[in-house]
Amino acid sequence: MTEKLRQILNAIKEFSIKALDGAAPLAKSAAARVPELAGRLFSFAVEWWRFGVGALFAVLVLYYPAGAFFFNRIDVNPAFNDGSKAAVKTADTLAALIGREVDKHAFTPNLPFFYPAAVLDNMPAYQTGVIDGAQKIAAVLAKRNPDAAGLQKAADALAYPATVWHVDDWKPAVSSDKKYRAAAADIAKYAADAANGDQVFDNSSASLKSFAAVLAEQLKSDSDTLAAQIAKGEKRVLDWSADTVFYTVKGRAYVWYLIARDLHSDFETAFLQAGVRKHWEKAVAALKSAVLMQPMVVVNGSPETQFAPNHLLGLGFYLSRAAFALNDLEHAVDAQSDE
């Protein structure tokens, strides 16, 4: 038994010696390859660092700026929908305008940060103003034509906040553009029903006065908004919020212009009177001048300065002229009714 144990121990010893003799070259080989492996790891890290820098460059320089440039569009086409032969042109233009801003152009006020257009500032302000103006006009249409339930429904939908995406406060939500798309459909249906005789449009002098009064009131409110921003700008070297105010008001002014322009088609009888027509032409001309203002950079300089313009002041001037002309139009309609 002792002899067998000795043989086993000797066999283990010989195996261990051979194993160590065989492992020595492997250890030397592994030690020799350590610098090579370290170099490969370093090269791998450098390549990924370069890729990361390139990806960051693509996002910061290409994705956001190029994407924003592609999406950016402040559409102030003065001839928009002017060729419409709809029975109620104001309603037809309003529906088409909402559809244009929501579907044809990207609706930007509610886009989250991962969209390139989310970095835009002026276009969201402009579109917010357009929707706000559209809501005011839809409310007037609903008030003057109470039998058309779709108009009030549209006015309510247009009052929905413009900044809601598909998620709000981490909960699923109805997006702003979906609400506005439904509003445009309701207004378009009313216009189609009026053309077919299934709905009526109040084209009385009282209705024209309502439109003129609301437009004049809104124009004065916009002028006050601009005046308040001008007063703030006098205390600053640079006014970073001036462009937002300018384009929000300009978006509303574009709606006022289109609706004022189309009043002539919807109230033809009233416009046979020269006085009414004269004041309407002044209002439309002033509003057209307002919406065609397109400064490269909005400047809110002091009204007394000789070195910097004040684009808000210029916009307010045209809006005030239009408001006075619409007030005069109201008086002309009254005078016509008294005859």
Spans of model-derived segments:
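Hydrophobic membrane-insertion alpha-helices, especially the h-region
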Residues: 50-66
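Short, charged/polar, low-complexity loop and linker segments
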Residues: 82, 107-119, 196-199, 228-241, ...
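Juxtamembrane low-complexity tails/linkers enriched in Ser/Thr-Pro and polybasic
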Residues: 30-44
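A cross-kingdom marker for long, charged
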Residues: 82, 256-339
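Extended amphipathic alpha-helical interaction segments
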Residues: 177-293
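N-terminal Sec/ER secretory leader and immediately downstream segment
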Residues: 75-176
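N-terminal targeting leaders characterized by basic, low-complexity, disordered sequences
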Residues: 1-29
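Short, well-ordered, aromatic-rich surface patches in folded extracellular/luminal domains
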Residues: 163, 167-214, 309-333
